[in-house]
């Protein structure tokens, strides 16, 4: 028996800091009991993954497996630093993933390798312990099946479904081989049973070969090895069947199975140089080939001269009966992964904790939003009240209003002022007068040329008349535009005249009222303003308290150790909401805010008795009037510019019509002159007296 060791996977040192921080967040008690479990986790990883474990390390495998299960149950699979492992197909290539499932799959893979290595060692003993080796091969197959059932990690090349299934079938084929060796060494076992066991051996190797061949990341050596093993055991199977046939005097059948056995043996020997396997494998095959050739040659001679029995036609061989005596066995160390293990018991489930923290954040966000709205409301009220109070004590309101009025005047001045507006309007008047004059001249000229052309029948035939009529129609369409420009000019003149009166009146009124208001003095209210500022200080203190509340986290309201006392999330959140309400005390917050606002309102009502309402109302009207005047100025200026653009475009269109008219007029005169010349020439040269001297070219045929 020859076996090939499953390639092992190696790993490297790993940082537990991210996992430690997450466990610290999830711990329910300040006594960090999870630290001991984490130390155990690191120690076992070094023992089982960094070094080479043995079959005596099964208890350590079990503990590490349980620790991983607990961390996965608490949804901490992705809260870890990257795990780095080599690929099974190449020890020089590595893959790295931040996931406990990947680490767990690698651990079970190493457990499978441990069982497999131990099984091969038992087979190589003298005498071999085939029964125990068979069990370990089945346990190794069970490990790969366990990975396939629970720890498929498709991102890794080593843990795709086809490759894991190939390893499982390969281990089962080796286990069935042990049973064959045990049965073959027992003289009491019948050949029919041995054949059935052997048939299952080569079928298992055949299945493993197909899976390895199609699996991504499969080591190429195992593709060749399973193929050779399949052919080797096929050869032996058909050799035993041929001997059974010979013993039953079925000589033709014996020869057919010998040929089939030799065919598979030669097929296996063809791979001699494909891969560097142990020379012993091919030495066995060569000896087997020689034996089969000798036996086939001898039996063919006997059958040809003595027995004369027909051989089995190619393709007519019956299917072989098989017996399966192995199966994948899940090791005891891989107990139920859903069981409750006594590790990290002080840590909450991550998903539960994340859900709680999300709800707590929503509760706190709602509280912050409510207090912000309350603060904003109070700030707006107090700001408005304080602005009114300050306007009573000083002339700031008057000054600000004066500045705003002056800003409006300055804006008008920067745009050119009334003189600039009148200048632009005057330019527009000139342009529109020019448009009217050009339009009338063009229409008059077209009418004259149309009347002149009507008397000339020859010109009508040449299309001149239709061109002039078409141009006349186009020019006539511009009449509406010319009239609109004239109307716009008249309207603008009226608006500018009215605007000049408004701006003069505004200037006189604003100067008079603002100068009168500036001379008035408000009563001394310094003492009352000090009182108002004290209310503002109380408000600032209240806002500082609220800002401190907004900085508090969930642990400041609800000790995390209390989570262990509430299995129901609704009751837990109810307690948290009550704790937040007790600390924020929204009712008390609103009462304190209302008291401050009421005090300021009383102060404002008292100060309003000193305010000169009439003047403030009048100055507001001045400000409004100045703003409207600025808007009207901008509107008039823009209107003048727009009408100027329209008039300029209209003038260009009429000028182009005049150019076309000039072209038609020149064309008309040129055609008349040419016609006169032609008439004179035709009357003077009616007959050519030298016509008999003209020589004509003869046409050549």
Curated annotation (Swiss-Prot):
| The keyword Coiled coil is assigned to this record | yes
Q: Name one GO cellular component term.
A: mitotic spindle pole body
CDD domains, alphabetized: BRO1_ScRim20-like
Q: Which SMART domains match?
A: BRO1 (SM01041)
What Pfam families does this protein map onto?
BRO1
Residue ranges of domain BRO1 in the record: 2-378
One GO BP on record is: vesicle-mediated transport
Q: Which residues form a coiled coil?
A: 630-678
> Has the keyword Coiled coil been applied to this entry?
yes
Question: What keywords is this UniProt entry annotated with?
Answer: Coiled coil
Q: Which domain of life is it from?
A: Eukaryota
Family, according to the entry, reads as follows: Belongs to the palA/RIM20 family.
Instruction: Spell out the protein name for this chain.
Output: pH-response regulator protein palA/rim20
Provenance organism: Schizosaccharomyces pombe (strain 972 / ATCC 24843)
Q: Which gene encodes it?
A: rim20
């Amino acid at each position: 028996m020859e076996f090939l060791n499953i390639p092992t996977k190696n790993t490297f040192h790993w940082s537990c800091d991210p996992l430690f921080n997450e466990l610290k967040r999830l711990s329910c008690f300040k006594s960090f009991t999870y630290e001991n479990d984490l130390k155990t986790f690191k120690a076992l990883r070094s023992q089982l993954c960094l070094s080479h474990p043995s079959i005596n390390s099964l208890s350590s495998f079990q503990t590490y497996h349980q620790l991983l299960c607990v961390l996965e149950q608490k949804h901490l699979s992705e809260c870890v630093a990257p795990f780095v492992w080599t690929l099974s197909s190449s020890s020089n290539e590595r893959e790295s993933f931040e996931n406990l499932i990947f680490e767990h799959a690698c651990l079970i893979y190493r457990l499978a390798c441990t069982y497999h290595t131990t099984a091969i060692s038992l087979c190589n003993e003298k005498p071999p312990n085939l029964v125990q080796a068979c069990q370990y091969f089945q346990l190794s197959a069970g490990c790969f099946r366990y990975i396939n059932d629970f720890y498929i990690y498709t991102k890794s090349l080593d843990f795709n479904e086809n490759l894991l299934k190939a390893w499982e079938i390969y281990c089962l084929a080796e286990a069935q081989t042990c049973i064959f060796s045990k049965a073959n060494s027992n003289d009491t076992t019948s050949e029919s049973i041995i054949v059935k066991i052997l048939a299952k051996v080569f079928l298992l190797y055949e299945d493993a070969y197909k899976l390895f061949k199609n699996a991504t990341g499969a080591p190429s050596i195992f593709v060749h090895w399973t193929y050779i093993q399949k052919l080797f055991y096929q050869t032996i199977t058909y050799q035993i069947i041929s001997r059974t046939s010979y013993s039953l005097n079925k000589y033709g059948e014996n020869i057919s199975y010998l040929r089939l056995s030799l065919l598979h043996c030669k097929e296996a020997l063809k791979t001699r140089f494909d891969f560097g396997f142990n020379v012993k494998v091919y030495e066995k095959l060569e000896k087997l080939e020689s034996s089969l050739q000798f036996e086939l040659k001898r039996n063919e001679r006997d059958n040809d001269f003595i027995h004369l029995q027909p051989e089995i036609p190619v393709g007519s061989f019956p299917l072989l009966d098989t017996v399966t005596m192995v199966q994948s066995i899940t090791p005891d160390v891989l107990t139920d992964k859903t069981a409750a293990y006594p590790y990290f018991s002080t840590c909450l489930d991550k998903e539960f904790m994340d859900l709680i923290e999300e709800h707590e954040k929503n509760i706190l966000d709602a509280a912050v939003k409510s207090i912000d709205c309350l603060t904003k409301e109070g700030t707006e009220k107090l700001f408005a009240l304080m602005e009114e109070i300050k306007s009573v004590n000083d002339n700031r309101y008057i000054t600000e209003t004066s500045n705003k009025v002056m800003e409006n005047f300055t804006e008008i001045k920067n745009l050119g002022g009334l003189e600039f507006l009148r200048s632009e309007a005057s330019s527009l008047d000139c342009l529109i007068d020019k448009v009217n004059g050009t339009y009338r001249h063009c229409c008059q000229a077209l009418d004259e040329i149309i009347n002149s052309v009507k008397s000339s029948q020859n010109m009508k035939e040449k299309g001149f008349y239709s061109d002039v009529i078409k141009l006349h129609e186009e020019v006539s369409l511009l009449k509406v535009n010319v009239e609109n420009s004239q109307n716009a000019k008249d309207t603008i003149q009226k608006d500018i005249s009215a605007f000049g009166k408004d701006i003069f009146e505004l200037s006189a009124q604003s100067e008079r009222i603002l100068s009168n208001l500036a001379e008035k003095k408000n009563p001394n209210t310094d003492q009352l303003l000090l009182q108002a500022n004290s209310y503002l200080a109380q408000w600032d203190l209240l806002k500082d308290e609220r800002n401190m509340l907004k900085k508090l986290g969930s642990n400041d309201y609800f000790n995390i150790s209390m989570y262990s006392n509430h299995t129901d999330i609704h009751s837990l959140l109810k307690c948290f909401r009550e704790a937040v309400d007790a600390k924020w005390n929204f009712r008390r917050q609103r009462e304190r805010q209302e008291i401050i606002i009421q005090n300021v309102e009383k102060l404002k009502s008292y100060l309003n008795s000193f305010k000169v309402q009439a003047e403030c109302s009048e100055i507001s009207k001045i400000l409004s009037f100045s703003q409207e005047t600025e808007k009207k100025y901008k509107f008039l200026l823009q209107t003048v510019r727009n009408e100027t653009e329209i008039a300029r475009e209209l003038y260009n269109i009429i000028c182009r019509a005049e150019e076309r008219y000039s072209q038609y007029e020149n064309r008309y005169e040129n055609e008349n002159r040419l016609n006169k010349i032609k008439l004179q020439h035709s009357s003077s040269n009616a007959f050519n007296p030298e016509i008999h001297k003209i020589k004509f070219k003869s046409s050549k045929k």
